[in-house]
């Protein structure tokens, strides 16, 4: 039943571009809160050791809903590879912008025979 409601809401929202009525918005909010509550209860039933070994999606939901807790630390990535990828991306973007700006002033004369 819940999946049918979720499918109906998603299909209505994305198919016609129609703005949801107040009833539909309220039903969607209730559904979302219920799903979040169920996930929190599921995490609470698991032990603290099992919670750390849980899936990444559960951890994201727990982190998103418990963002006000004192347990959450600074949001700094500790993954070396990801940090290197971010730095490489920034360097590539800055380099491409510099290359574009440097080449923008040069106009090659057309050779006509």
Curated annotation (Swiss-Prot):
Q: Which organism is it from?
A: Arabidopsis thaliana (Mouse-ear cress)
Q: Spell out the residue ranges making up region: Disordered.
A: 41-79
Q: Where is the composition biased (Low complexity)?
A: 55-73
Question: What biological-process terms (Gene Ontology) are attached?
Answer: photorespiration
Kindly list the places in or outside the cell where this protein is found, as annotated in its UniProt entry. Answer: Mitochondrion
According to UniProt, the name of this protein is: Uncharacterized protein At2g27730, mitochondrial
Which keywords does UniProt give here?
A: Mitochondrion, Transit peptide
The UniProt GO MF terms for this protein read: copper ion binding
Q: What is its main location?
A: mitochondrion
Superkingdom: Eukaryota
Q: Name one GO cellular component term.
A: respiratory chain complex I
Transit peptide: first to last position: 1-14
Q: Which InterPro entries match?
A: At2g27730-like
């Amino acid at each position: 039943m819940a999946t049918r409601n979720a499918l109906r809401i998603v299909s209505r929202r994305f198919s016609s571009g129609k703005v949801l009525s107040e009833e539909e918005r309220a039903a969607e909010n209730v559904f979302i809160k219920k799903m979040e509550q169920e996930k929190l209860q599921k995490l609470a039933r698991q032990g603290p050791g099992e919670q750390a070994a849980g899936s990444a999606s559960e951890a994201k939901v727990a982190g998103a809903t418990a963002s006000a807790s004192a347990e959450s630390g600074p949001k700094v990535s500790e993954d070396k590879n990801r940090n290197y990828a971010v730095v490489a991306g920034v360097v590539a973007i800055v380099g491409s912008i510099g290359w574009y700006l440097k080449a923008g002033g040069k106009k090659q004369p057309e050779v006509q025979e």
